[in-house]
Amino acid sequence: MAAGKEIRGKIKSVENTKKITKAMEMVAASKMRKAQDRMRAARPYAEKVRNIAAHLGEANPEYVHPFMKANDAKAAGIIVVTTDKGLCGGMNTNVLRAVTTKLRELQSTGVDVQSVAIGNKGLGFLNRVGAKVVAHATGLGDTPHLDKLIGPVKVLLDAYAEGKINAVYLSYTKFINTMKQESVVEQLLPLSSEQMQAQKTGHGWDYIYEPDAQSVIDELLVRYVESLIYQAVAENMASEQSARMVAMKAATDNAGNVINELKLVYNKTRQAAITKELSEIVAGAAAV
């Protein structure tokens, strides 16, 4: 029964793997709910800041913030948001494929691309393909912290404000629902005039500025862009946990199928061995 012993060992090994994937599935499900709550909580803030900035812009049409001005620089920036860890299906592969397409599109027009990586997977990929990585942020954990994101992202925001790059793109995995996530590459800068339209209300707005309107608008638009990046990272984290939960569930189900198949093989092997022994006993008795 050497073969039977080997099969039992395989069954035990797969059962242990199944326990691990099941535990990871449950942990991911718990983290997913928290990540979704953070993602939803961030949306009203970004919308409120955008609306206030839009009202201020309408009240001061003579001032146009650098983030809303186009320029002719032959360079662009892209912020690539991925995960720090794997075991989340094809999520990172999909977003990096979209990034590759965007990089080729920009480089084909002679545009020099500067990259900021958020997440280990994106950083490793950009280094492998020889992209120009000007800053990165890794080890964010399960909760996005704006103070960890501001430093790396500010490199591209400052470059745009100074006219060194003509656009900033943001690539991440957009959360649709638990079973569906979508890889996107969105233009972050310049901000479009449609994007900065204020919500129509039935009353007028009158502000008292301290120290002045330009300073307030400058600060608000920077906060708005930062909130968009935070929102993207929050959505990416919610997508990560959803994708990991689905991937670990699939792994657990597959492990169960493998165990059933191995048990069937073991039972057939054991039955064949017993049949052989009985045949030998009968043959021996007949010979006597």
From Swiss-Prot:
Q: Which UniProt keywords apply?
A: ATP synthesis, Cell inner membrane, Cell membrane, CF(1), Hydrogen ion transport, Ion transport, Membrane, Transport
In the UniProt record, does the keyword Cell membrane occur? yes
Q: Which is one Pfam family of this protein?
A: ATP-synt
List localization entries.
Answer: Cell inner membrane
Q: Is Membrane found in the keyword set?
A: yes
Gene Ontology BP, a term: proton motive force-driven plasma membrane ATP synthesis
Its predominant location is membrane
Example GO molecular function: ATP binding
Any one GO CC term of this protein is:
proton-transporting ATP synthase complex
Family annotation (InterPro entries): ATP_synth_F1_ATPase_gsu, ATP_synth_F1_gsu, ATP_synth_F1_gsu_CS
Membrane topology classification: Peripheral membrane protein
Q: Which domain of life is it from?
A: Bacteria
The record's comment on protein family reads: Belongs to the ATPase gamma chain family.
Q: How does it assemble?
A: F-type ATPases have 2 components, CF(1) - the catalytic core - and CF(0) - the membrane proton channel. CF(1) has five subunits: alpha(3), beta(3), gamma(1), delta(1), epsilon(1). CF(0) has three main subunits: a, b and c.
Entry function: Produces ATP from ADP in the presence of a proton gradient across the membrane. The gamma chain is believed to be important in regulating ATPase activity and the flow of protons through the CF(0) complex.
What protein does this entry describe?
ATP synthase gamma chain
Source organism of this protein record = Acidovorax ebreus (strain TPSY) (Diaphorobacter sp. (strain TPSY))
The gene name on file is atpG
